[in-house]
Amino acid sequence: MLIRVYTKKPGAPPDFDDGLILRRGVSVEHVCHAIHRTLADQFKYALVWGTSTKYSPQRVGISHIMQDEDVIQVVKK
């Protein structure tokens, strides 16, 4: 099964036109690798909007499991 994850830049609306297609059960680390291979090494935290979080946005760590149509904003060190 596949899920759609959308990215968001700080101060800008989410980019719903160009999402990432990933397997169900992937973590924030997998999303970082899909964006850029060195992004996971520079990862500080992520803000996630969607059904995988209790609050919108919620600050999550690298092991957070993403769900379909989540929006992620990655903050680097």
Stretch-by-stretch model annotation:
Residues 1-77:
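C-terminal-of-GTPase-core extension/linker across diverse P-loop GTPases
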